[in-house]
Amino acid sequence: MDLQTLIQQDLKYIWHPCTQMQDHEKNIPLIPIKSAKGIYLYDFDNKKYIDCVSSWWVNLFGHCNPYINQKLKEQLESLEHIIFAGFTHKPIVELSKRLVGLLDSRLCKCFYADNGSSAIEVALKMAFHANVIKGKKKNKFLCLENAYHGETIGALSVGDVGIYTEVYQPILLETLKVKAPCGEDIEESLQELKEIIASKKDEIAAFVLEPLIQCAGNMNMYSSEFVKEATKVCQENGIYVIFDEIAVGFGRSGSMFAYQQCGVVPDFLCLSKGITGGYLPLSVVVTKEEIYQLFYAPYYENKSFLHSHSYTGNALACACANAVLDIFETENVCEKNKILSEFIWKKMQILGEFAFVKNLRHCGMVFAFDLVGFEGQRKGLEVFNAGLKKGLLLRPLGNTIYFMPPYIITQEQVCFVIDSLKEILEQFRV
């Protein structure tokens, strides 16, 4: 099949995610990828693109990583998948023990799903159900404005990015929203949170937030002090706290898990994306013993948490996740990332010379800036298309440009990316 036929048949049969398909006819080229290695994607003309967004924030250690490949192949020879109700297997037992070993001792029970949105759904249902078991009629959730937690109904309900939620408002769950903090500016948000809790605490099952970074919310970064104080207020008032670390977990925020920078422990920790290094779908909700014990009862009491997915606990995905943890353990990843993050941040300062580049910011291995003064113009799309010509895969959030690379990117490759970005931005000078 030649390249044009491949593109034509894709557009004939496939409806791509988060895409206005008409754009592929006018504004955005559809690029078939033939192979990938390390930080590079290769198209059918053997042109290479640096994966600046870790393929939607999932790839940590490069495409076709030799070690993860090896572990996946080994697992393929023994077990690919089994029903995870009434059965178990070695990869998931090992993974669960290792995850719990990395977390605060209070987070000790793992419930698996197969994507980030599903992890949020699990946590929401668990929090609601736990309150039901305790005899409390709490049917609302508290969340932040500008939040994004996924695109299933429950996850959308606790989100606040209008492009995703607006059309579905009539069918979403009832939620209470708090002004999102920004940077060190947290007092107004905290006060609003306290006021809502003071008047509604008997109705609120849980508070959901992405600690430190609202990723799909234009990479809004905010103080760990807000996370700490908000969590304390909620837990002191009998409100469960759900941390969505689907994007920021596994080293992305600068620590292995973002909550570790905040001095508090959530009641539910949702993890996905980087957990398998970008290989296979997997997510997990890690919760506390006291929550688990609420559901632990004789069958006839009907307290079971009856939630399941066909591919829950997939052995191949778990083998990849164990390989990812091996790499973290043996290669001192988080410490190396601190050095790399500092280098990237210093290099990014050259972009500050443009008057239309505002709010240069970073947290761990997430870097972003905003293009201002272009209201009504799709400058982010222009950056995307110009990036492709220079061999960069960028995927701006509107006019917010971000850089979220695999951890294996070299300093030389970083310089190429940022110098190329500078050349692209030169075109926007008036």
Show where each model-derived region lies.
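Conserved N-terminal phosphate-binding loop of PLP-dependent enzymes in the Aspartate aminotransferase
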Residues: 1-430
